[in-house]
Amino acid sequence: MSIFPKISLRLEVENYLKAGFMNEEQFNGLSFPILQHPDLQDVLLIPVIGPRNNIKQQPCEVIVGAQCGNAVLRGAHVYVPGIVSASKFMKGGDVVSVYSDIKGKCKKGAKEFDGTKIFLGNGISELSRKEIFSRLPELKGVGVRMTDPVYLSPSFDNVLPSYLFLQNLPSAVVSHVLDPQPGEKILDLCAAPGGKTTHIAALMHDQGEVIALDKISNKVEKIKQNALLLGLNSIRAFCFDGTKALKLDMVKDTDGEPPFLPESFDRILLDAPCSGLGQRPNMACTWTLKEVTSYQPLQRKLFTVAAELLKPGGVLVYSTCTVTLAENEEQVAWALKTLPHLQLQRQDPQVGGEGMLGAGLSSEQLKRLQRFDPCVVPSQDSDTGSLRDARIEDTMWLANKDCIGFFIAKFVKCKST
């Protein structure tokens, strides 16, 4: 979770969070420790508590889709569009057990479901079954308010939206590795939904220019909304395909709009489209081999464009939220061979582990990479007692490791192309 817009923890922000999320009465006797990351001064950590295995399952059931289930595991309530099925006699105010249909087999509107499902916890239904499946377009709000989830993570819905932005820890690390400076011109080549874009602008103290590209128009609008909400004026977002961002005819610049002339940017973030195998939680593993292997060529196209758009002496950071060798270390090896004007650099801060063997990189090169791999963390339950009693060093070690799968590489362009 990053703090905006200044790179310091405002006392009133920290106190507000502690008052809310350490309120044991509100959270049924539980409290959430709030920790400042020792290496990232603008990041607060709030651990997830669970799994909580003593929750009594109820006869009245609500079935949700896998994506909705993922959101519930991260602290969200159940919104009406995510509800697939509900028990026949469910009324507003009933205590219900919520399950995720991880295989997508439950039919919309079913009155019962005996297929594969994962228990997410209990909540209070806000609406009756009849109201939920009435197909009224205005029914988009909360359908079940989660009161006793298996994984307890506080909801940040409308919590200081002009000060905070929720991120996974590695996503916050990326912008620090890029190290944008006030007055620079920065490109976020694949920017949606804008968490890293806004973080970059905040790190620059909103001084300079941050260009954000994405080829899907509604995602670009989301970037603009986030920038407006956080009071950041240095961001310009465009609906544009990053693979076509390089202007080839060498005519005069187009008033700062894409495509761009070569060597236009001081720093570039390429948070590339990827297979997303590092995302957590994820209860819907629907990828085919064809899909998983389709990203490498696209990433290389974007890599080539980014290298051309970078000024000599400029910094390029490549990142993904996946764990495959092909999309990470192999891409670094390919870039060093194909784009010899790029040099692999050490990273600061170094929060994750080093790179993985198998792509032909030297041990020194692997040490210059950051790989976040939750597989290295032993499975364990967490509760407020264990978190309260743990040493701060152990808690931080766990926070740095027990996160999403992620990869970061940093390059400097040593000469003009």
Where does each model-flagged region fall?
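Glycine-rich nucleotide cofactor-binding entry segment
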Residues: M1-G194, T198-L203, S217, E221, ...
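C-terminal catalytic and target-recognition region of SAM-dependent MTase-like enzymes
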Residues: Y16, Y151-N158, S162, A245-S275, ...
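The conserved SAM/SAH-binding core of class I Rossmann-like methyltransferase domains
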Residues: Y99, L187-L189, L213, F238, ...
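Short glycine-rich, flexible loops that bind phosphorylated cofactors or substrates
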Residues: K105, G195, G276-L277, L325
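Short loop/turn motifs at secondary-structure junctions
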Residues: P182, D206, G231-S234, S264, ...
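Short beta-strand element of Class I
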Residues: Q207-I211
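S-adenosyl-L-methionine
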Residues: L213-E263
